[in-house]
């Protein structure tokens, strides 16, 4: 799978351990292990809280280029100050930053536009997805519709939590 572009989608902190520094470090460590295994040439991340940002941090740590595909310029407008600070720390490390829609937040639909851009511009999708409805499910469904290979990471994540933490 080396020399391919990986897009990532996954759950927010509520479903992957919470907002603590410890939870964030655990998720980033898992992201690093996943990146070492798949060895992508570059990664596309939607920069959402949780999995997306953990993957961005793991890319920085491993010196893997990543592309930030943001739904709009105010993606972080409703986040807690600590979350906004992390987002603003990560963005300058992106090789490129793309916005699904220009300007300010037009509504939740722009996140699906972003998801479709990520899937369209990647070779495969790595999904930290537990099967529940929501934005991650929508991204996975679009990737399936487009015939993209999907690496399902939920079971490896559960194993990691049980055996490595």
Residue ranges and their predicted role:
Residues 1-165:
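Acidic/glycine-enriched connector segments
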């Amino acid at each position: 799978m080396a020399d391919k572009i990986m897009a990532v989608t996954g759950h927010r902190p509520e479903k992957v351990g919470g907002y603590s520094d410890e939870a964030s470090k655990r998720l980033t460590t898992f992201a690093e292990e996943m990146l070492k295994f798949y060895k992508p040439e570059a990664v596309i991340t939607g920069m959402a809280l949780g999995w997306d940002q953990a993957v961005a941090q793991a890319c920085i740590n491993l010196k893997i280029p990543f592309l930030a595909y943001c739904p709009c310029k105010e993606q972080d407008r409703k986040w807690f100050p600590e979350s906004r600070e992390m987002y603003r720390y990560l963005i300058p490390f992106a090789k490129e930053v793309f916005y699904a829609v220009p300007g300010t937040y037009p509504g939740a639909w722009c996140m699906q536009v972003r998801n479709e851009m990520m899937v369209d511009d990647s070779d495969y999708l790595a999904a930290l997805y537990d099967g529940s409805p929501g934005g991650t499910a929508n991204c996975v469904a679009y990737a399936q519709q487009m015939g993209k290979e999907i690496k399902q990471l939920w079971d490896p994540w559960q194993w990691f939590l049980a055996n490595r933490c």
